[in-house]
Structure formats: structure tokens, C-alpha cells
Swiss-Prot record:
Region (Disordered): 275-299, 518-557, 574-604
Function: Required for maturation of ribosomal RNAs and formation of the large ribosomal subunit.
One MF term in the entry's GO annotations: mRNA binding
Official protein name in the record: Pescadillo homolog
Location, primary (coarse class): nucleus
């Protein structure tokens, strides 16, 4: 049969059928551009970059399947209801119908994003992998001032602050913090939760100024989704360590802006996972049981009022979050090392140091901390304090039983995983350079001087070699014998290699002498010692080195000719990257040399 005839231009194929421009997508969904942006942010739909742009390079393209996916979402209808509601409120105010306007304002249409969390993250690990930007955004808004003109409301700021402190309380309680770094942008943290490395940035505790070149509508849309995501993750993490969520804060500490320590009120609620009501609110039929329950409530309330005064160096007493159960955090190597870094150390924070950051870091590594102000667990006159964190040129009053260090010492100890010497961090002295733990010095090709010092300190701290617990005495003897045998074999291999090098050198010397006209028979007949002029030997070595380099270059050129264009481009990019690293290393070495020379000149 003849093929069915189809007029040209009636059916789209290829990229024209797969992708659609943003303008056409907005018309297809019958929504405004602002609503389209909000819908794409909440649903996780992002623009695409097709190889062949049918409508032109200046257009923004989306996948047609994504737009069809958005068309069936119930959020579109909710956004339309919100738009209609705003029109009704505006019309009621225009007609001066205050009662109708108040009724409309008290009953606005709402929507929830719980369904979107389940759609975008099928498993909990997927949600943890996408938590970096979420934590950075939430911590940013927790430090911003509330501005009604930009729709940054006070309630939203307080919610961000609550979520961030709940996250920090979990990380600190489970000792999951691994790295931290102070930069110009803020303070970087990296934690490991259920095998996933999560990195986020918190701003410095300074007065923030909102600029006019930032679109807060887009940021608030992201924040709306991130608040729901972080609340869901906190809920799952708290229940994973047998803690009910959300925690109940101590009003006294909350009023003193100590929300992180206000979580100690949590255990006073009498809730356990699985119970829907507090233990003190269960009503009994008999009067005697009612009296006993009222006495229990009074004792629990009294304990709740005094609970913040308990010593914070007890296991789990940092936030008083975890019930007495053996299902605590996993005892892996990193957790053990982090838990015992600041063990048996007591810190006191002066008022000029970054208090919230240090209150988060020090307990996460097993230390006990207090601060200057109301609601603190202990005051400055406590004789058990081992370190006082000070960031001022001089210290007026000094306790001889403690050390006064700068805040950088805490961060450097955390990154090095050892207690560093405090001589370089004392009050009034310029501290050592603050090295980033996120940079691999070996891969970069340049190791700073202080990094080498820290490596030597780490090696000294780990110098004690202990037998493995799974090996007995006989196994230890066998392992020692095997090590001695391996050592002897390696020595034999080194001797053979040395002899081969000597023979090869002798062979090259004979070739060079033969090239110059001298023979081996003449040398032996004259009974002259086998001595070669140093200058001739150097020239021969240079010639051999040049020949080796030329051979390597020829082999590299031959291998390049056998590569495809893509492989050659990749190799060229790698070589360019290596050259850039070398130039950067040379620049750093030059700067260090100039700095050392200038410092020595000043010392004179």
C-alpha cells in the first residue's frame, strides 16, 4: 500500500518536539511568569540547553515532558485560588467593606509541600545529598533582619533560626561534625550524616544589610521549599536517635537568645516516641491516681526549671535530647575521634568571640563550654576551666590555672584532630595561617609550612604503635618474621638495581671512549686506573639525559597521533591544568620567599 501522505510542517520532530521556549510554556500553562518561576522552583524543573536551538540562541528552553508534568500539578489551581483571593481582598477594601476584608484575610487559601518532598526525594539519602544549599539558605535568612517591604517576615526569620539550631543540636549531639573553616564569606562546616558529607556556609554574626540588586521573591520561594525539607529531615534524624520532635524550648533561655542551650527543656515535656499525649496530662478515673499524677507534674516542672544547671560534660547532657537507651550514634572511628578531642576540657567564651559558632563546635567534639552572660552553666571564676577563648589585644585579669587562646585555635584543632600547642595562639600574638581543610595540598603540589608542622605533630601524636587486637603473640611473631623477610628482599632488589646502574654507566663510558678513539686494550696495556675526567662524565650524563627526554617526547608524540580528537583535547586540558598548578605553586613560593626576606629585614 502507498505510504500515508502527510503535509509538510504538520508534525514536529527532533528538538522542535522535545523542547519548548519559556514564553510558549507560560502560554501553555496559562499562568504568569512569576507563578511559572515559583512552580519550577518548587517542582525542581530547570532549563535545558539543547544542541540545536530551533527558536534561537537567546531563548530559554525547557523539556516538553517537564512542562507536561507541571500542567497536571495541583499547585497551579492553588496559585489561581490565591490570586483570586487577593483580588477579593482588594475589592473589599476598595468598597470599604471591612468585615468582609477581615473574614477573607483570616481565611486565606493555603497549600502544603510535603507531597513535593516525597516526589523529589524517593529515599532519605537523596534528601541528605541535596541538603547543602538548603542549610546555607536557612542559615542565611536566620541572620537577616526582618523587612516587611521585601516580604521578609519576622515569623519566617524565627522559623529559620529554630530549624538551624535544631540541625546544629543534632550534629553536636551525634558528634557528626568533621571540618570547619573561617573565610571572608562566613564559616564553612562539613558534617557526615549516614555516610553523606554535607557542607554548608553560615554568615558571620554581623549586622546584615539587604541590597537592592537581589530578587527576594526567588530567594523566598527557595526558602519556602527548604524550610519544609529541613523540617522533614530534622524529624527523621531526631526519631533515628529516639528523640521526639519538635523539641520544647526552655522559655528562660529562649528569652536570653540561647536557643541552642534552650533545647535542654526538651526532656521535660514527658513525651516519648509513640505517645500522643504528655505523661502528666493523662487523666485517671480514681482520685488517688489524680493526686499522684499532679505530684508527678509538679516534680517534672521543678526538674525542668533546674535542668539547664546540670553539668554539660555528662554523656548526652549537651542538649538533654536523648533518652537513656543504647541506640545512640554509631561508634565508628571518626565519631570516637571527634567525641574525645576536647574530652575533659572546659572552655569559657568571652563576649567578643563568635559565641554561636563555638557553642556549636566545642560540644560536638566532646568539650564543655560556657559563656559570659545570663543562663550560662558556670561563670568565669570556675577553677575547673582549662581554656578561655579571648579575641582582644590584652587580657586585664588572668587566672593562672587556665590558658588564654584565640578562637582560631579551636578551629585549627578541629581540622587537625589533635590538641595543637597554644604558644602561637596566645592573646596579643599574630596567630599562624588558618589553613583550609577542604584543599588537598598533595594534589595541589604545594604544602604550606604550617601544614608540614601540623603533619609532624600528628605523626608525633600517633607514634605509639600497638599490636592489632585480633592478633596474638604467635601472629605478631609471624608478622615480624614476614616483615624482616620483606625487608631483606627489598634490600636485595636495591643491590641488584645498583649493580645494573653501575654496569650501564660503565657501558656508556666505554661507548663514549670508543667514540673518542680510545680502546679498552690501550687502557689495560698502560695499566692506567679506570678514571674518567669529571667534565667528560658530566657532558656524557647531560647527553644521556637529553636523549632520554627526546625519547620520551617522541613516544608521547606517537601516542598523541594514535588518540582521537576528544582524547587529545582532554590530554591538552590536563596538561594546561598541570602548568597552571605549577605556575601557582611557583607564585606561592615566590611570595613566601619575599615575605620571609621582608620579615628578616624588619627583624634587623
Amino acid at each position: 500500500m502507498p505510504k500515508h501522505y502527510r503535509p509538510a510542517g504538520k508534525k514536529k520532530e527532533g528538538n522542535a518536539a522535545k523542547y519548548i521556549t519559556r514564553t510558549k510554556a507560560v502560554k501553555y500553562l496559562q499562568i504568569s511568569l512569576a507563578t511559572f518561576r515559583k512552580l519550577c522552583i518548587l517542582k525542581g524543573v530547570f532549563p535545558r540547553d539543547p544542541k540545536k536551538k530551533v527558536e534561537g540562541n537567546h531563548k530559554t528552553y525547557y523539556h516538553m515532558k517537564d512542562i507536561a508534568f507541571l500542567a497536571h500539578d495541583p499547585l497551579i489551581e492553588k496559585f489561581r485560588e490565591i490570586k483570586v483571593h487577593r483580588k477579593k481582598v482588594k475589592k473589599a477594601f476598595a468598597k470599604k467593606n471591612k468585615d468582609l476584608a477581615d473574614r477573607l484575610l483570616n481565611r486565606p487559601p493555603t497549600y502544603k509541600l510535603d507531597r513535593l518532598i516525597l516526589e523529589r526525594y524517593p529515599t532519605f539519602v537523596d534528601a541528605l545529598r541535596d541538603l547543602d544549599d538548603c542549610l546555607t539558605m536557612v542559615h542565611l535568612f536566620a541572620a537577616l533582619p526582618a523587612v516587611e517591604g521585601e516580604r521578609v517576615q519576622v515569623q519566617r526569620i524565627h522559623n529559620c533560626r529554630r530549624l538551624s539550631h535544631e540541625w546544629q543540636a543534632y550534629i553536636s549531639r551525634t558528634h557528626s561534625l568533621r571540618k570547619t573553616f573561617i573565610s571572608v564569606k562566613g564559616i564553612y562546616y562539613q558534617a557526615e550524616v549516614q555516610g553523606q558529607k554535607i557542607t554548608w556556609l553560615t554568615p558571620h554574626a554581623l549586622q546584615q544589610v539587604l541590597t537592592d540588586d537581589v530578587d527576594f521573591n526567588v530567594m523566598l520561594t527557595f526558602l519556602e521549599f527548604y524550610e519544609t525539607l529541613l523540617g522533614f529531615i530534622n524529624f527523621k534524624l531526631y526519631h533515628s536517635i529516639n528523640v521526639n520532635y519538635p523539641p520544647v524550648l526552655d522559655p528562660r533561655l529562649e528569652a536570653l537568645a540561647s536557643e541552642l542551650y534552650a533545647l535542654c527543656r526538651y526532656m521535660s515535656s514527658g513525651r516519648v516516641p509513640g505517645n500522643s499525649e504528655p505523661a502528666g496530662l493523662i487523666e485517671d478515673k480514681e482520685g488517688e491516681d489524680n493526686k499522684e499524677s499532679s505530684k508527678t507534674d509538679e516534680s517534672e516542672l521543678r526538674l525542668a526549671q533546674l535542668q539547664h544547671q546540670l553539668p554539660t560534660n555528662e554523656p548526652g547532657a549537651l542538649m538533654h535530647l536523648v533518652q537513656e537507651s543504647t541506640a545512640a550514634d554509631a561508634d565508628d572511628a571518626d565519631a570516637k575521634e571527634c567525641r574525645s578531642l576536647f574530652k575533659n576540657l572546659k572552655f569559657y567564651l568571652s563576649r567578643e568571640v563568635p559565641r554561636e559558632s563555638l557553642l556549636f563546635i566545642i560540644p560536638a567534639f566532646g568539650g564543655t563550654v560556657s559563656w559570659e552572660g545570663e543562663g550560662a552553666p558556670f561563670d568565669e571564676t570556675d577553677e575547673d576551666i582549662t581554656h578561655q577563648i579571648v579575641d582582644r589585644p590584652t587580657q586585664s585579669h588572668v587566672f593562672l590555672s587556665r590558658e588564654y587562646v584565640q578562637p582560631q585555635w579551636i578551629y585549627d584543632c578541629v581540622n587537625a584532630r589533635i590538641i595543637l600547642p597554644t604558644e602561637g595562639y596566645i592573646v596579643g600574638r599574630v596567630p599562624p595561617p588558618h589553613l583550609s581543610p577542604f584543599v588537598d595540598n598533595d594534589a595541589e603540589g604545594y604544602i604550606p609550612e604550617y601544614a608540614e608542622t601540623i603533619k609532624r605533630l600528628q605523626a608525633a601524636a600517633q607514634s605509639q604503635v600497638l599490636p592489632l587486637p585480633s592478633l596474638g603473640d604467635e601472629d605478631m611473631e609471624n608478622s615480624l618474621v614476614e616483615a624482616i623477610i620483606d625487608r631483606s628482599e627489598s634490600n636485595e632488589i636495591a643491590d641488584k638495581k645498583r649493580k645494573l646502574e653501575m654496569l650501564e654507566k660503565q657501558y656508556h663510558d666505554e661507548l663514549r671512549m670508543e667514540y673518542e678513539g680510545k680502546t679498552f686494550s690501550n687502557r689495560t696495556a698502560d695499566n692506567q686506573p679506570d678514571v674518567v675526567d669529571k667534565s667528560d662524565t658530566k657532558e656524557a650524563d647531560d647527553h644521556m639525559e637529553d636523549s632520554h627526554k627526546q625519547a620520551e617526547k617522541d613516544a608521547a608524540d606517537i601516542s598523541k597521533t594514535l588518540m582521537s580528537r576528544k582524547q587529545r583535547g582532554l590530554l591538552q586540558a590536563i596538561e594546561i591544568n598541570q602548568e597552571r598548578k605549577k605556575d601557582k605553586v611557583n607564585l606561592l613560593k615566590k611570595r613566601k620567599k619575599n615575605a620571609d626576606s621582608s620579615a628578616s629585614a624588619k627583624g634587623r
